[in-house]
C-alpha cells in the first residue's frame, strides 16, 4: 500500500474525529485491471481500469453510520466525515455495534501467497483470448462465437481504526474464458468455460478451456423437458458451490441474530449428512477469497463450520456475536460500499471418494444439473426452487440434454441427503465436489 493511500485513510479517521465522532474505522481499496476481448479472431476491446474507493464507519455514543466514496481530495474527505457524523447522530442506538478493541485486533499478520508479481502484458492477454476462442471454434458443429476474453487484475486492501489498528495486503487474479454457439435444426445453444486463479501458473491451458466450452455447447443440442416427479439430482461441481453458498447464508450470524434462518436453533445438531465437513479457510495460499484479517481488523483462522454433519459455528462479526452472547470469530467481510457484516472467505465442502461417473452409475432415472437459472430460496423456511438445465440420466448413464426444468426441495432435507464426489476445484472461493441429492422434485413436461 502506497504512502499516499496510508495518508488518505489517516485523513479519513482524522476528519471523523474532527467532525465529532467518538471513534471510527475505515477501509480502502485501490484496484487496477486489464482485459481483452476477441471475437472471431479480431480484438473487439482492450481496456485498462483503475479504481479507488473508501468506506468510513463512525460512532457517536451508541449510534453509528457508514458512508463510502471514490472522491478522496481533502475537501471531499472532510465533507464525507461530516455527513457520516450527522447521519450517526440521528440514527437509532445500536448497543451491539462497536470498534474492535486493541486486544481483539490482529497482531502479527500471517504470510499468505496472494500476489503474483508476474504481470501479463496486453499482448499475452490478447494471445490467450485468441487461443481460447480459436480452440473452441476448431470443433466441428460450433457455428459462432460470442468471444474469448482474458484479464488480469490486482487490488490493494487496507483497514485502519481510530484506536490504532492499521494493516494492508495486496492480491492478484487472472483468468480467461470462451463463449460459443452451436446450431441444430434451426435451434441454437450456447455455453462457456473459463479458468481463473490468483497465479497465472495455476490456470488451465487455453486450448483445454476452449475445447471444453465447445464440448459443453455441442452436448446441449436437442434438449428435452424432463419428466415431472421425485428423482435424485446431481449438481455438477460447476454449480455445486451454490449449495455451499446457501449453507453459508443459513449460518450467517446476522441472520441467526435476527431469527431469519431455518437453522437458527440448530447449533450442535446434525444439519447435513454424516461425514460431511464444511471448512472456511481465509488462510489458504493462493485462495481467491483469502485474507490476512477480517473486515473489522480481527485475526482470521481456518475453521470447521460443520464437522461430520454437526453444526459447530456461525459466521460472526462483532455485532452479531455480541447480540448472540458469543465471541467474535474473525469472519466479518467488508465491501467498500457497506459496513462490515458476517461473511465467508474460502468456504468449501471437503472432497469425497466417489467419481462423478460413480454417482451417475448408481441412478436409474435422475437429473444431472450443469446450469442454474434464477432462484427462489426462503431462508426462513428452507424452501428451495431453482430453474435448471443439464442432462437426464437413464440406466446409470447420461441420456440426453435437458432444459426448462425446475428443481425444488427443502434445504433441511437436502443437506441431509448429500452424497459427494471427489472432483472439487479448490481454486473457487465457494466450492464443493459434484453432489448427489436424493428425493428432489423435478418439474418439466
Regions found by a protein language model. Name each.
Residues 266-445:
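Dual-mode signal for accessory low-complexity, basic/Gly-rich regions
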Amino acid at each position: 500500500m502506497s504512502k499516499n493511500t496510508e495518508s488518505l485513510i489517516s485523513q479519513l479517521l482524522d476528519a471523523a474525529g474532527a467532525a465529532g465522532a467518538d471513534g471510527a474505522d475505515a477501509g480502502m481499496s485501490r484496484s487496477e485491471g486489464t482485459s481483452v476481448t476477441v471475437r472471431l479472431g479480431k480484438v473487439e476491446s482492450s481496456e485498462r481500469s483503475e479504481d479507488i474507493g473508501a468506506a468510513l464507519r463512525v460512532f457517536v455514543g451508541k449510534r453509528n453510520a457508514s458512508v463510502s466514496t471514490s472522491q478522496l481530495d481533502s475537501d471531499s474527505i472532510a465533507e464525507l466525515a461530516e455527513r457520516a457524523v450527522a447521519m450517526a447522530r440521528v440514527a437509532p442506538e445500536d448497543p451491539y455495534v462497536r470498534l474492535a478493541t486493541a486486544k481483539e485486533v490482529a497482531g502479527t499478520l500471517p504470510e499468505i501467497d496472494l500476489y503474483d508479481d508476474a504481470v501479463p502484458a496486453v499482448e499475452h492477454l490478447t494471445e490467450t483470448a485468441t487461443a481460447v476462442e480459436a480452440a473452441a471454434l476448431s470443433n466441428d458443429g460450433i457455428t459462432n462465437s460470442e468471444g474469448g476474453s482474458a484479464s488480469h487484475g490486482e487490488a490493494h486492501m487496507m483497514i485502519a481504526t481510530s484506536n490504532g489498528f492499521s494493516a494492508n495486503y495486496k492480491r492478484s487474479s487472472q483468468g480467461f474464458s470462451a463463449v460459443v454457439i452451436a446450431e441444430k435444426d434451426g435451434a441454437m445453444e450456447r455455453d462457456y468455460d473459463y479458468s481463473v486463479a490468483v497465479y497465472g501458473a495455476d490456470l488451465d491451458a487455453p486450448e483445454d478451456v476452449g475445447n471444453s466450452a465447445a464440448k459443453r455447447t455441442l452436448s446441449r443440442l436437442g434438449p428435452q423437458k424432463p419428466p415431472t416427479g421425485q428423482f435424485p439430482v446431481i449438481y455438477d461441481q460447476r454449480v455445486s458451490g451454490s449449495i455451499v453458498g446457501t449453507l453459508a447464508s443459513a449460518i450467517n450470524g446476522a441472520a441467526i441474530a435476527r431469527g431469519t434462518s431455518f437453522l437458527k436453533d440448530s447449533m450442535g445438531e446434525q444439519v447435513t449428512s454424516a461425514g460431511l465437513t464444511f471448512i472456511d479457510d481465509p488462510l489458504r495460499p493462493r485462495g481467491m477469497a483469502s485474507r490476512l484479517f477480517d473486515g473489522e481488523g480481527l485475526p482470521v483462522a481456518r475453521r470447521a463450520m460443520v464437522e461430520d454433519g454437526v453444526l459447530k459455528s456461525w459466521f460472526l462479526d462483532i455485532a452479531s456475536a455480541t447480540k448472540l452472547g458469543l465471541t467474535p470469530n474473525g469472519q466479518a467481510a467488508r465491501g467498500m460500499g457497506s459496513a462490515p457484516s458476517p461473511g465467508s472467505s474460502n468456504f468449501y465442502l471437503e472432497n469425497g471418494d466417489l467419481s462423478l461417473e460413480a454417482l451417475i452409475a448408481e441412478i436409474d432415472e435422475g437429473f444431472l444439473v450443469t446450469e442454474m437459472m434464477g432462484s427462489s430460496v426462503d431462508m426462513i423456511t428452507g424452501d428451495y426452487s431453482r430453474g435448471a438445465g443439464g442432462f437426464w440420466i437413464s440406466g446409470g448413464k447420461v441420456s440426453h440434454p435437458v432444459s426448462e426444468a425446475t428443481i425444488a426441495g427443502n434445504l433441511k432435507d437436502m443437506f441431509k441427503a448429500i452424497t459427494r464426489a471427489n472432483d472439487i476445484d479448490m481454486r473457487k472461493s465457494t466450492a464443493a465436489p459434484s453432489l448427489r441429492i436424493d428425493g428432489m422434485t423435478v418439474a418439466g413436461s
